[in-house]
Amino acid sequence: MNNTPRYPQRVRNDLRFRELTVLRVERISAGFQRIVLGGEALDGFTSRGFDDHSKLFFPQPDAHFVPPTVTEEGIVWPEGPRPPSRDYTPLYDELRHELAIDFFIHDGGVASGWAMQAQPGDKLTVAGPRGSLVVPEDYAYQLYVCDESGMPALRRRLETLSKLAVKPQVSALVSVRDNACQDYLAHLDGFNIEWLAHDEQAVDARLAQMQIPADDYFIWITGEGKVVKNLSRRFEAEQYDPQRVRAAAYWHAK
């Protein structure tokens, strides 16, 4: 029997900047607006990791975005100011040849503001994902911790796991400011999803109660940078394999 641990694997993608067209705008949840993109530039798009991120470049009034040149030495940007950009989880439908981005709607965000105003025919430049972390789907136990910013990646992962003949044991701790956001994951059955107040101490207290198996597990923690750092400390103990614990900041409080 091969007892070698199974670990997530990193893969690289060729970096391309794609100008895509808004095909549809859908309010898929009380808290999320979906923008569906398409176009010939989507040819060759690939995204193998459930928490991949693509960088979106938001158009500015009276300004035409000129993408940089990608060379073997790196990215060469043209002179002048760059448009604002944000990282988002790509939800790619290979059969329909469409790329969906789910935006958490909140006040004051350049991305949220654009998503609320977007109309079919609008243009959006999308870069990446530059690389993917391919996480095995069949870990016996899987723990996911996130706030609203990580919910699209969590949704993508759970939709994939739901298609397995044998589902793994999954626990998800999702902290939200508004319980109306829960409908974003309402269609996913067979998983233990716990909804918590948007409070670091509440999440940490719940983590302290959880029993993580000694092997064959995967742990994923995302959210605000300092919160992720603090929550992930308990998984730095020697009984946890760092290659099966993924902690990533999705945003930073100002």
UniProtKB/Swiss-Prot annotation:
It catalyses: 2 a Fe(II)-siderophore + NADP(+) + H(+) = 2 a Fe(III)-siderophore + NADPH. It holds the Pfam family SIP. It is found in: Cytoplasm. GO terms for cellular component: cytosol. Residues 15-136 form the FAD-binding FR-type domain. GO terms for molecular function: FAD binding; ferric-chelate reductase (NADPH) activity; flavin adenine dinucleotide binding. Disruption phenotype: Inactivation leads to ferrous iron chelator resistance as the wild-type. It is an enzyme of class 1 (oxidoreductase). Induction: Repressed by YqjI and Fur. YqjI is required for nickel-dependent regulation of yqjH, while Fur is required for iron- and cobalt-dependent regulation of yqjH. GO terms for biological process: cellular response to iron ion starvation; cellular response to nickel ion; iron import into cell; siderophore transport; siderophore-dependent iron import into cell. Plays a role in iron homeostasis under excess nickel conditions. Belongs to the SIP oxidoreductase family. This is NADPH-dependent ferric-chelate reductase. It comes from Escherichia coli (strain K12). The lineage of its organism: Bacteria, Pseudomonadati, Pseudomonadota, Gammaproteobacteria, Enterobacterales.
